[in-house]
């Protein structure tokens, strides 16, 4: 596995060229990118811009819960965008899955996701790209909603298995692993191909597990509430070879100058690196 920079996740909003420069300066091996940018500029220019950094992964470029007519159109476009990602050597894409719904009960929502994710998985598979889905662990995200949905690792793995395209796995975020009550043994039981993408961060101290709020986090290693090093060691032990990025939702970080924000993030990841 390797350290990758996601500039948007730490509030850095500068051109990709500057992001690449900051990533290389601070020891990152890869960078997350906008797949539409890669398609627009073409593979030669994209590779030149990345300057040797690995193209870590790209987020699914549309909301898969859209209207059926829009979804069909967007999946067709996804094939073209995936070809652009393939051309620069990217093999990973990911998105998050809401842990609630106001209209669909669990089983109905599960079938909806199976159908939609099958289309997405097949479109990406044509270009050698794996698709990671993030379950959301916090109970506070489900509170106040009519129906609960997937919010644990085992449930998400079931969706991957039952959808059956062969290229589906987890976007495994240690925050959601922690808030869902996950254990290191759960991580150690995974196969490397079941993990597509990895996010790390920490949680504020003194807050019960079922009261942790999704958008109140910390940099990895900042508080020690989450055993981030143990989490990464478990991933290393199963042979995970993909990117690891920080997603701290930190107001303090987002208010820093870009060069400082990237440097602080790199130092935080290094502090928990196996």
Identify the residue ranges that each predicted region occupies.
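Short, basic/glycine-rich phosphate-binding loops at helix/coil junctions
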Residues: 55-59, 137, 211
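Histidine-acidic metal/acid-base catalytic patches
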Residues: 1-27, 44, 51, 83-84, ...
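Active-site acidic/histidine proton-transfer and metal-coordination neighborhood
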Residues: 67-169, 179, 256, 260, ...
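Conserved beta-strand positions in the central sheet of alpha/beta enzyme cores
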Residues: 32, 57-59, 94, 132, ...
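Active-site-proximal loop/turn and secondary-structure-junction residues that shape catalytic pockets
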Residues: 9-11, 35-39, 61-64, 97-101, ...
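Glycine-rich, proline-tolerant flexible connector loops at the mouths of alpha/beta enzymes
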Residues: 32-51, 101, 105
